[in-house]
Regions:
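Short glycine/threonine-rich loop-to-helix capping motif typified by GTGT followed
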Residues: 64-71, 258-262, 295-317, 345, ...
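Active-site-proximal alpha-helical scaffold in enzymes
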Residues: 90-121, 153-188, 227-233, 342-365
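Conserved catalytic cysteine-centered active-site region
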Residues: 63-114, 122-154, 193-219, 252-254, ...
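Conserved beta-ketoacyl condensing-enzyme motif
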Residues: 27-100, 106-107, 111-132, 285-307, ...
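Long, well-ordered mid-to-C-terminal structural blocks that present hydrophobic/aromatic surfaces
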Residues: 262-299
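Short, well-ordered amphipathic alpha-helical segments that serve as non-catalytic structural scaffolds
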Residues: 32-48, 72, 99, 155-159, ...
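Beta-strand segments within the central parallel beta-sheet cores of soluble alpha/beta enzyme folds
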Residues: 51-61, 87-91, 115-120, 172-179, ...
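Condensing-enzyme catalytic core mediating Claisen C-C bond formation in acyl metabolism
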Residues: 4-32, 141, 165, 176, ...
Length: 405
């Protein structure tokens, strides 16, 4: 099997355009129209590349409610004016993170020069029971659902196990994640929950699944996101594009059921995906300037700090309390607001993370712009950890020198 480093030795791939819809509730939109808007915005940011330049597309969606599951990929690309071969990727919440990975593979291997990758989801028109069902199928459907377990309940088990294993951790640490991400989301014009919350707001909110409260859980969301992945030759031929190099991509799978895995206080697939991405990029956690991580529930962000190597096991609460992951900290995490405040349109989430990385690395983040970041990391998880993908982007276009850390 080709190693991550050998894969990195193939031709380079670049993200040269990225766009997304607002995330929220849009009863007058369809999954087709949302994705078309994201494609329009990605192409508008791509410095002269147009629909005629796209060789193929890879898209991700869960298909909440069962809408157009069989051919939703071609349905959205044809509606968006892209008559190209289209593949739909399914990996629960990691669907479009994997779509981006597949696009990178196609470009790096030489199978394509320009690939559009993205995702979409419409969730807010579904009833609560329908949403619970479709989130539940991201877990182990025969046994976890048989016991009445919900998606929130599964992560609550992880949260309780973390509190029991690491005595210094408290429920207030979950609330600190919410406070940070709501503050970031309040400044993001695309975010669903554009308001701040206090520690008391988060800790005293209604319990969803003990010990998780409402503010420890992401919302249900409609939205779409898309990015253009191109070869180094295409990037060099279009000097007006703002390019970020795909330095590394790592992916891993695991047993789908939480009860089938050896630990409740880590997501091994995230750890393995990160190791592969770091190896391919020839970099380390210390080189990462900012990250977008999969905070579907507050406990998931704390686990991500540890799974991605930002700190040792059990030290995530300390990292958070010390402000390291704040917007003005040493390692800002979820400056977009994360899934918690930006929103979690399942199939669009992974691509949306790449949109944020591209904006920050190319200076397109507006008032939210970080101070000269060079390396960004996106972390996207499917279910409770049955799949994970980690993508590392670096500042700099084809032929440009990317400064070292």
């Amino acid at each position: 099997m080709r190693s991550a480093r050998e894969a990195g030795a193939m031709r380079d791939a670049y993200v040269v355009g990225a766009g997304q819809t607002d995330f929220g509730s849009f009863p007058d939109e369809s999954y087709r129209s949302l994705f078309a808007t994201a494609v329009d915005r990605a192409l508008a940011s791509a410095g002269g590349l147009g629909r005629e330049d796209v060789d193929e597309a890879v898209v991700g969606t869960l298909g909440v409610g069962g809408r157009q599951l069989g051919l939703s990929g071609p349905a959205v690309t044809e509606f968006a004016g892209l008559s190209v071969p289209t593949t739909r990727v399914e990996n629960a919440c990691a669907a479009s993170g994997y779509a981006v990975r597949n696009a990178v593979q196609a470009v790096k291997s030489g199978m394509a020069d320009v690939v559009l990758a993205g995702g979409y989801e419409v969730m807010t028109d579904a009833s609560g029971d329908t949403t619970k069902y479709w989130l539940g199928v991201s877990g182990e459907t025969e046994w976890e659902r048989l016991t009445g377990a919900t998606f929130a309940g599964t992560y609550a088990q992880m949260a309780r196990a973390y509190l029991d294993e690491h005595g210094a951790a408290t429920v207030d640490d979950f609330s600190r994640v919410a406070v940070k991400n709501h503050a970031n989301g309040s400044e993001n014009p695309h975010a669903q929950l554009r308001f701040e919350c206090s520690l008391d707001d988060a800790s005293d909110a209604a319990t969803v699944a003990d010990p998780l409260t409402l503010y420890h859980c992401c919302p249900t969301t409609d939205g779409a996101a898309a990015v253009l992945v191109v070869s180094e030759e295409v990037a060099a031929d279009h000097p007006d594009t703002d390019a970020a190099r795909v330095a590394g991509v790592g992916a891993a799978s695991d047993r789908v059921g939480l009860f089938e895995r050896d630990t409740y206080t880590a997501i091994p697939a995230s750890e393995r995906a990160a190791e592969s991405a770091y190896e391919m990029a020839d970099t380390s956690p210390e080189d990462v300037d900012f990250a977008e991580v999969h905070d579907c529930f507050a406990i998931a962000e704390l686990l991500a700090y540890e799974d991605l190597g930002f700190c040792e096991r059990g030290e995530a609460p300390e990292l958070l309390r010390e402000g390291v992951t704040d917007r003005d900290g040493r390692l800002p995490v979820n400056v977009s607001g994360g899934l918690k405040a930006k929103g979690h349109p399942i199939g669009a989430t992974g691509a949306g993370q790449i949109v944020e990385l591209w904006k920050q690395l190319t200076g397109h983040a507006g008032d939210r712009q970080l101070d000269d970041p060079e390396v960004g990391l996106a972390h996207n998880v499917g279910g409770s950890g049955g799949a994970a993908v980690v993508t590392i982007l670096e500042e700099g276009g084809a032929g440009q020198e990317v400064s070292g850390k």
